[in-house]
Amino acid sequence: MNKYMSVNVIFAKFSRDYMATKKYLPIRPSEMGVLNILTRCEGDFTPMKLAETLGVSKPMVTAHINVLLKKGYVREEPSPDDKRSFYVRPTEKAIALADEAEAKQTEYIKAVEERLGEKDFAALTELMEKAQVVLGEMIDR
């Protein structure tokens, strides 16, 4: 196997295993991404601002919001400035789930850091970020 195929296999295994750490979630990881923004970032978020923050389309965010509304994780609050617009607000249920998810993900990531050591973990983080930037620039968003 050549080095590029080896890296491809490693990336695939890492992606699979990382996604497996989120199997306990009662919602999809992409929907959890919306909740993370709403519960961990300051400010008011409209669907458009959520889409921009996440780097995805507004229709995709709208679909996520609709699911989260039905499941009781978010509520809509009319904008006082623009009657056509609304803010998406997390519910207490969303905050509780975000807290639980953060604790579990931190546990997994700390385990990786403990196994690698502080220096290798920092290097891994830096290299993964660089690789993500390159891939992000190459794919059609």
PLM regions: where:
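Pre-recognition alpha-helix immediately N-terminal to the DNA-recognition helix
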Residues: 6, 33-37, 96
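C-terminal regulatory/oligomerization modules of transcriptional regulators
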Residues: 1, 119-141
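N-terminal helix-turn-helix DNA-binding core of bacterial DNA-binding proteins
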Residues: 16-60
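N-terminal positioning helix adjacent to the helix-turn-helix/winged-helix DNA-binding module
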Residues: 3, 30-31, 46, 93, ...
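N-terminal leader segment of winged-helix/HTH proteins
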Residues: 1-25
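Charged, amphipathic alpha-helical coiled-coil/dimerization segments
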Residues: 67-126
